């Protein structure tokens, strides 16, 4: 939701109109946002359109003053190519790598809490979610214990029952995560 609404704040602040196109992978969130936007704004200023590839194709064929896109690099290339036809300025939020570094001077409990929160927020499906941890070998065991405590505080004894523990958005996201885990299972230290 934040990836859709944060750019809207900038557009409104600049006096621009906006058309929001939420992800089809989160239909309940999209419907909620559409309802809120329609209650708050006249649709000539801010509107929401929903759909999948067909809607994207229609939108890509239109002339825009600017495009702010959040999503995959593959779709980002399509957005950029479509925008180039009209020399439309584009901001692409395509994610990246977000390492965490824990050195010997770090407060282990604080680091573990923050990393656990950042990685489990939205099932780690944000572009700023921690991807990997670089930690001094002497801190590995202390950190692992602190991280386990932090996860327990966030999600309780059974994460599956926690109202704060979210799930991966679809089977494809699960398959990608599973593939990464399997590829690195000999070097992973699982909590």
Where are these regions (language model features)?
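Rossmann-like NAD(P) dinucleotide-binding subdomain of oxidoreductase/dehydrogenase enzymes
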Residues: 1-110
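General alpha-helical segment detector with a strong preference for membrane-spanning helices
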Residues: 19, 100, 140, 188-189
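ALDH superfamily catalytic-core signature
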Residues: 41, 74-182
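Short connector loops/turns at beta-strand edges and beta->alpha or beta->beta junctions
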Residues: 8-11, 152-154, 186
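Single conserved hydrophobic/aromatic residue that forms the stacking wall/gate
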Residues: 180-183, 187-191
